[in-house]
């Protein structure tokens, strides 16, 4: 059993070796074919170039002498032969180099296979790590070879064109920011100046108002002029209004409050309005009664009902009969006259009513009717 197993293992190893050798041979054959194809292409390209060169020389040498053209053709042929020989030698050298490289690759592959067979008994982790490192190293070496094989191509446009000069112009964004900062600074300065001017004007107005309130507005204005301060028309107007307020306060005893504009309010009219307000809203005293109020209260129409209605309409309070007895002789005479007048008015009203409603007159004409009214 042990011998059979050993023989089977050896047979498998020989089969794997044969397969790998066959693969290696096929790869070498492909590489050779590829290199031969490249060589043929290069030969064709060189031959095409030579044919073109010959055609150009034939065209250029038509008008020249035959002796010169023959000597040149001989020289050209000798040169072309030398070039072909040198190219063939370089191709042979390249082929020999490629063969040596292929041999080295085959040797390295066989060595790798032997190493893999030996390291199968070791741990899987080590085996994986080594295989990864080998694959990475192979890929890196291939990349290096490709880089070496590729010639460096320098772009003529980049080499010929000079580098652009550095920017020496103005930056518009920075200029705009600087201009904005300058404008803001100017606006701040102007605002500060205006605030200072307003404060100075207010101080001058306060000084003028205080001077006018003391009573000598003209003298104070003269003092301001003497001191050297500029007296504006506003200050002069404020001084005049302060003088008027002081005069109204001395006459009426009513001062204009500070929340009113002194230039827009007349102090005399304001004092009159305040007096009227006090008269309206103050409480009435019991003893104070005017003559007209007494006359309307004592008015008598000759009929008690009419007297009561009239007093209710006028808002007069009813008085006692005892108070009515104590009346002066003059007032009694006036009351009698009022009663007679009201009686005559009632009679005339009734006569006019009878004429208008019944359309009948007293007598034949207008005079008789008027006499009848008089007799009544």
Swiss-Prot record:
Basic residues bias locations: 53-155
Domain of life of the organism encoding this protein: Eukaryota
Family: Belongs to the RSRC2 family.
Region (Disordered): 1-171
Cross-link (Glycyl lysine isopeptide (Lys-Gly) (interchain with G-Cter in SUMO1)): 317
Record field: compositional bias (Basic and acidic residues): 13-52
Protein's organism: Mus musculus
Name assigned to this protein: Arginine/serine-rich coiled-coil protein 2
């Amino acid at each position: 059993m042990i011998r059979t197993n050993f023989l089977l293992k050896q047979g498998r190893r020989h089969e794997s070796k044969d397969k790998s050798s066959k693969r290696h041979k096929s790869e070498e054959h492909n590489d050779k074919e590829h290199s031969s194809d490249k060589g043929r292409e290069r030969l064709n390209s060189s031959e095409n170039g030579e044919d073109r060169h010959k055609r150009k020389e034939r065209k250029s040498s038509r008008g020249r002498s035959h002796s010169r053209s023959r000597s040149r053709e001989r020289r050209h042929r000798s040169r072309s032969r030398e070039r072909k020989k040198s190219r063939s030698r370089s191709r042979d050298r390249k082929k020999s180099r490629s063969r040596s490289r292929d041999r080295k690759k085959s040797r390295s592959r066989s060595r790798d296979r032997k190493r893999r067979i030996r390291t199968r008994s070791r741990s899987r982790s080590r085996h994986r790590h080594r295989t990864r490192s080998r694959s990475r190293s192979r890929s890196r070496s291939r990349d290096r070879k490709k880089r070496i094989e590729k010639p460096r191509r320098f772009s003529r446009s980049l080499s010929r064109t000079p580098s652009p000069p550095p920017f020496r112009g103005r930056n518009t964004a920075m200029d705009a920011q600087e201009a904005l900062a300058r404008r803001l600074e100017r606006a701040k300065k102007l605002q500060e100046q205006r605030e200072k001017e307003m404060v100075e004007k207010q101080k001058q107005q306060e000084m003028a108002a205080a001077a006018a309130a003391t009573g000598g507005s003209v003298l104070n204005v003269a003092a301001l002029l003497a001191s050297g301060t500029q007296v504006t028309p506003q200050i002069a107007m404020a001084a005049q209004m302060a003088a008027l307020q002081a005069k109204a306060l001395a006459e009426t005893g009513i001062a204009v409050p500070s929340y009113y504009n002194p230039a827009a309010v007349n102090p005399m009219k304001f004092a009159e309005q305040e007096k009227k307000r006090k008269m309206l809203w103050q409480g009435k005293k019991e003893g104070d009664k005017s003559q007209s109020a007494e006359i309307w209260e004592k008015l008598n129409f000759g009929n008690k009902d009419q007297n009561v209605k009239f007093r209710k309409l006028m808002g007069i309070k009813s008085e006692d009969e005892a108070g009515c007895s104590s009346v002066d002789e003059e007032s009694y005479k006036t009351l009698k006259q009022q009663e007679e007048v009201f009686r005559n008015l009632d009679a005339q009203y009734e006569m006019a009513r009878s004429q208008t409603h019944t359309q009948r007159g007293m007598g034949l004409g207008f005079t008789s009717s008027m006499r009848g009214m008089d007799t009544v």
